[in-house]
């Protein structure tokens, strides 16, 4: 009887232990599933990010843009809910918002960080990057952390602090400052402007800033390449995480991620210091003269794109002439000028108007099967090498097993139009397809530089105005206190 009683006690204890173990797990699962349910109930996905040229920014037209924005928008559409973006200044703010349930996902080209795994879940990887130490071109290049001769700054919220603590054992004189106010982009710009000596930043952020600050130079990689992820709230496997996994798999299979990456940073690998520096100088000194014309004749295009085309064609020189006879700002052939009914190809207004109209016409010639946001790249290739050769490139792509409606597939085959084994079987024959390839890539790079140049300029203007307003308010407060003191003295 006593043995039976002990067995009953043991069974009850085991059941209580099982309940104690399972119940919290169920609570965790229910909590995280409630987050997914809450997203559906509120009809809105809230994503936190950091404002920069790659992840998220508001362009000159007031529209949201960026890789993380477009990917987040696609995920929100997948969930059939609206999207709300909350822009943070740094990683600390971002992860704090995630921890405190102010956002559902943190998405800002965030590298895999083992020190975050106790607090957060990571989504599937969709990119890779490394930490790089950067310095200002024209100053002495350090070869290691032990050769730094000045101030080193990092943005808050990353694994860098822990990494640098380890490095300090090797380099005892290593000192750094964690900046809790500035974004990585702002830190890089300050370094380029001589306010900071060194910065460690994500290689993606570095490549983006180099398009507007070409004196940002990479000294060395601090780490090897690591995977990039979205971060989700803590807890176990959840319905939200499962949905994200399904979405990412679909985005990879359909080419969505490849198209978004192509749009925002695949062309950044072509960075050229001399060309970028000359281009930015032209943006400052030449573009303001012609910007109103690009705006006037943009039609359905972004005026920055039209300006980028003109720079690629003539470096904004209205009198430009090539050995083949093309002339003017948009480097029009005589036949195209006659077709567009313009009299003087060297007149900048006539040239820009005709170039825009011709490009709009080329866009209408693209098959409806090509996605709306990719039609412009096909049209630009046709603008450069002719519509017939572009059609040949699409046919060749199809014959090689690619998708003729996918710009990524077609552009990699453009150089083949100059190879005899391929062009002999094409309707329009030989073409310098490699030139068309670089033509489109350059225009995309030039356009991004214009967009972000004006974005940074506007941010600096707003910062200056805020500073001036604060100074005026401070002066008024001092004056008010002085007047009060004077009144008190007079009364006495």
Curated annotation (Swiss-Prot):
- What Pfam families does UniProt report for this protein, alphabetically? SBP_bac_3, SLT
Question: One GO BP annotation here?
Answer: peptidoglycan catabolic process
Q: Residues annotated as region Non-LT domain?
A: 19-268
Q: Record's CDD domains?
A: MLTF-like (cd13403), PBP2_YfhD_N (cd01009)
Q: Which range is the signal sequence, renumbered to this chain?
A: 1-18
At the top of the EC hierarchy, this enzyme's class is: lyase
- The active site annotation covers 313
Query: What is a GO molecular function of this protein?
Result: peptidoglycan lytic transglycosylase activity
Please report the record's description of how this protein sits within the membrane.
Answer: Peripheral membrane protein
EC number(s) recorded for this UniProt protein: 4.2.2.n1
Keyword list (alphabetical) reads:
Cell outer membrane, Cell wall biogenesis/degradation, Lyase, Membrane, Signal
Q: Where in the cell is it found?
A: Cell outer membrane
Q: Where is this chain primarily localised? A: membrane
- Fetch the SMART domains from UniProt: PBPb (SM00062)
* Keyword Transcription assigned: no
Region annotated LT domain sits at: 270-492
Show the InterPro entries listed in the entry: Lysozyme-like_dom_sf, MltF, Solute-binding_3/MltF_N, Transglyc_AS, Transglycosylase_SLT_dom_1
Q: Which family does the record assign?
A: In the N-terminal section; belongs to the bacterial solute-binding protein 3 family. In the C-terminal section; belongs to the transglycosylase Slt family.
| Chain's role | Murein-degrading enzyme that degrades murein glycan strands and insoluble, high-molecular weight murein sacculi, with the concomitant formation of a 1,6-anhydromuramoyl product. Lytic transglycosylases (LTs) play an integral role in the metabolism of the peptidoglycan (PG) sacculus. Their lytic action creates space within the PG sacculus to allow for its expansion as well as for the insertion of various structures such as secretion systems and flagella.
Q: What is the protein name for this chain?
A: Membrane-bound lytic murein transglycosylase F
